[in-house]
Every structure is written in structure tokens, then in C-alpha cells.
């Protein structure tokens, strides 16, 4: 798809995780989307491969690519096979913009062998109807879109962060913000 797209990173640093994934309603100065992923390749009901990694937006003179597009480019070029079913799970710092949501929905419509679940820390411009429609288009294409809760943040910390065996430390307001964002997402997807 795009030869300038970098391969996924193995993990991120703790400060990056706490800054980028904090589930605030309004998250000023968080201008990047980080996407942690797992890909399970399934043949005859058995997991035959397992990939994990981290993408972030690539914004430079050569490439302007949101994290979702980076993932799709890598996945199509390096992983995707018509003879394998895939369960893909994303943990994102922001929900997709309308353009990325549309591209992902179109990709899934063309590849019935790929199932996607998205856990997101925050909803991007959730008051904007275009962004709401993007989330609905994903849901209509069979994507389970969910708000990250404590166990999801902990999972990301344990699997996608260079954590030096330190435990995940939840921030003040995590549970309250989760409830608020979950209600907003339910309203959008109704």
C-alpha cells in the first residue's frame, strides 16, 4: 500500500502511555493517535499465528498517515492471506476520524475473513456528526467499538509498554471518565 510506512513498534514508554491513553473528555495537546494491536490468525478453529505491536501517526514530509492507515498498510502488505481468518483487536488512544473509519469499514467489507474489535481510550470529537457517523459505519460493518476500562488499560500496560515490571497505576477519574464515555458511545451507536 505505502512503502514509506514503518513497521510496528514493539512497545511504548510509560510516560507516553500515561499521557496518550489517559481517558480525559477533553485531551488538549494529545495530537497523535496510538494504536496497540493483536492479530490472531485462525485456521480450522486453531490460532496459527499471533502478532502484536504498536503504531502511531506518521506525520513527516514523506508520509502523512494516521495510525489506523499505518496498521492497514502493514497488515495488507505483510500479514493478510485469503486462506486465513483473522481476529484483530485494537487499543487506541483516540477513536478513528471519519476518513479512517470509512477506510476501515471499506476494508472490512472487502475482507470478510477479518473481524475487528476496537477498544478506545477517548472519543474523538464525539459531538461532531461526521465523527459519530464514522463510528456508526464501523459498527454497521460488524466492528465491536468499546470504551477502554480499567482491565483494558492494565492489559495495554502489561503488553505494550516498557514497564520494567512496574504495576499499572490508574489515574484519578479513570472509572468516572469511562462511564461518561461509555454512555456517549452508546448514544452514538443507537
Curated annotation (Swiss-Prot):
GO terms for cellular component: cytoplasm; nucleus; P-body. InterPro entries: APOBEC/CMP_deaminase_Zn-bd, APOBEC_Cyt_Deaminase, CMP_dCMP_dom, Cytidine_deaminase-like. Zn(2+) binds at residues 66, 97, 100. The keyword Repressor does not apply. It comes from the Eukaryota. Residues 29-138 form the CMP/dCMP-type deaminase domain. The keyword Metal-binding applies. It is found in: Nucleus; Cytoplasm. DNA deaminase (cytidine deaminase) which acts as an inhibitor of retrovirus replication and retrotransposon mobility via deaminase-dependent and -independent mechanisms. May also play a role in the epigenetic regulation of gene expression through the process of active DNA demethylation. Belongs to the cytidine and deoxycytidylate deaminase family. Homodimer. Interacts with TRIB3. This is DNA dC->dU-editing enzyme APOBEC-3C. It comes from Gorilla gorilla gorilla (Western lowland gorilla). The lineage of its organism: Eukaryota, Metazoa, Chordata, Craniata, Vertebrata. The gene is APOBEC3C.
Amino acid at each position: 500500500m505505502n512503502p514509506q510506512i514503518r513497521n510496528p513498534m514493539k512497545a511504548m514508554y510509560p510516560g507516553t502511555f500515561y499521557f496518550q491513553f489517559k481517558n480525559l473528555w477533553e485531551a488538549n495537546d494529545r495530537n497523535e493517535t496510538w494504536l496497540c494491536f493483536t492479530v490472531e490468525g485462525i485456521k480450522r478453529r486453531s490460532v496459527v499465528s499471533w502478532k502484536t505491536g504498536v503504531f502511531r501517526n506518521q506525520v513527516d514530509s514523506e508520509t502523512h498517515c494516521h495510525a489506523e492507515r499505518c496498521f492497514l498498510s502493514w497488515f495488507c502488505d505483510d500479514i493478510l492471506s485469503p486462506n486465513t481468518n483473522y481476529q484483530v483487536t485494537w487499543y487506541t488512544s483516540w477513536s478513528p476520524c471519519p476518513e479512517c473509519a470509512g477506510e476501515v469499514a471499506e476494508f472490512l467489507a472487502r475482507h470478510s475473513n477479518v473481524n475487528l474489535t476496537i477498544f478506545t481510550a477517548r472519543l474523538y470529537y464525539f459531538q461532531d456528526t461526521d465523527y459519530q457517523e464514522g463510528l456508526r459505519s464501523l459498527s454497521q460493518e460488524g466492528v465491536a467499538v468499546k470504551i477502554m476500562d480499567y482491565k483494558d488499560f492494565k492489559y495495554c500496560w502489561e503488553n505494550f509498554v516498557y514497564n520494567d515490571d512496574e504495576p499499572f497505576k490508574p489515574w484519578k477519574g479513570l472509572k468516572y471518565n469511562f462511564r461518561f464515555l461509555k454512555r456517549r458511545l452508546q448514544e452514538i451507536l443507537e
